[in-house]
Amino acid sequence: MTIAPTPDWNPRSDAVQQDQIAAYDHLRDQYGAAYSEMLHWSVLGHADVLRILQDHERFSNVVSRHVAVPNGMDPPEHTAYRALIEPYFTQERVEAFRPVCERITAELLQALQGRREVDWVAAFALPFAVRIQCAFMGWPMDLEAELTEWSARSHAATLAQDRPALDALAAQFEGIVARMLDERRASGADPQQDVTASLMHATVLGQPLGADAIASILRNWTVGEIGTISAAVGILAQWLAEHADLQATLRAEPARQPEAIDEILRLHGPLVTNRRVATCPVEVAGRQIPAGGRITLHWTSANRDPRVFEAPGEFRWGRNPQDNLLYGAGIHVCPGAALSRMELGVALRALLAAVASLAPTAQASEPAHYPAIGFARLPLQLRWA
């Protein structure tokens, strides 16, 4: 019988949840790999995270009893499903979706016109993320409230480690997917024009996708993207509100916006962690992890490692983009990176064009709690152009 190590930290503590970035920086510098009852072995250094990402034989992605396509798979199964998914995120498809993203962005900003103070998360970041994902998958916009509530309840249940609630939420999402599939069967939706209908006709290794696989893919494309895109849009707005000089630079030189987005999101990542499991006894950052040991990779910490990024807490132009783990690395690198970059670029460019200045207000922001990051509430002052 394996005896669990004495915990090094508590991910649910108030101190961690009030400032996740500072907490993970401290853990990385003190431990490299730190144990907790909730997250088990948290790996925090850039080199260690990269090593694990590139070694699926010793660090498996098969971490859940639920189907997770393709992020919960290892080769060769992962390879087959990845080949199915990647065509949905080609540059051609991304550019075809750009006008839809621009329309949604314009509608949200138009609704805010004239308001001098807003909670940016509630007024823009969250509805933007939900609406663009619904549009991408061909889902109706009247799902916005249900998906927003579902996402919030899922985050709360994850932090509380409430297994019955998580199971109920999984069943609820499967119900949403079932409704979407039934609607397409009834209407004869064109798989060439509708992403969800296309998945219903897809095959892997000569076999049609099962209902569990379709639900898993759609869950990744909704839950994952809603959380990370809304967090990213909030983080970008907060950083620019605090740095008027960078605002001015990006208005004057819009071609620099893509690099700025990636650097801001290196400083304050929109995704906190991913999971792995050790398939054999391994040593990571001087800690002994047994076979079957649960591992949590901390993107936010790895991307602020001073051994890779000089002055890691500073915004700097010209950093090596290959070092930035914003979209992961290795065989599980985010297949939707081009889509996410387009969406964030559209949102930022439109915001900077619509407002002459973006600034903090006297009200304090509220941090989002794990597994989310960024802001639960972000009061901003807008001066319209």
Show which residues each predicted segment covers:
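Cytochrome P450
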Residues: 1-385
